[in-house]
Amino acid sequence: VGLRIEPNNHKAIFQLGNIYLMEKNYSDSIKFFDKSIKIKPNFWQAINNKGLAYFEENNIDRSIKLFERAISIEENAEPLLGLASCLRTKDIKLAVELTKKALNKNPNYVDYEYRKEQLWGEKLQTSTETLLKNEQLQRDVILAKSKINSSS
C-alpha cells in the first residue's frame, strides 16, 4: 500500500529488499536494492546490502566492488568488515587493516548475533568468524568485546 502511495520511496523499496534478503531470496533482494539505488544513487546501505546478497550467491568479486562503492560514500563499519571478509583469502594484510578500522568504528560487529541482526548471511558470517580468529586481530577482537561489555 505504501509503495502505491509513494512509489519512489527508496527506503521502503530498500526494506522490501531486506525482507527478501532475510528470506534468502537473493535475486529478488538485489532487484529491490537496484531500484532503491536507481532512485537514490548514493544510498550506501542499499549498495552495501546488495554486496551482502551477492556474497551469499558466491559472487565475491561483485561483493568487493559493492562494498568498495559503499565505503567511498560512507566509511561505515559494515561495508569495511564486509570487504575485509571478501579479501580474507586474497589479501590478508588489507583484510586485517580493514577489520581493525571496522571494529574501531563499531565494536558491535565483533558479535555474531549483532551481524545477524544486520542481515548478514551464513556464508559471510562464516568468512567473518574465520577472519576474526586471525592471530593479528586477537587484541582488536578482545578490545571490541570489552567495549561492548562495558556499554551494556
Predicted regions and their residues:
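Terminal, low-structured helical/coil segments at or just beyond the last alpha-helical repeat
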Residues: 104-152
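TPR/TPR-like (Sel1-like) alpha-helical repeat modules
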Residues: 68-77, 81-111, 133-137
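Canonical tetratricopeptide repeat
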Residues: 15, 49, 82-83, 118
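Helix-start (N-cap) detector for alpha-helical repeat units in TPR-like alpha-solenoids
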Residues: 10-11, 26, 44-45, 60, ...
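TPR/TPR-like alpha-solenoid repeats
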Residues: 19, 53, 86, 119-122
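Structural signature of tandem alpha-helical TPR/SEL1-like repeats
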Residues: 1, 22-35, 56-69, 91-98
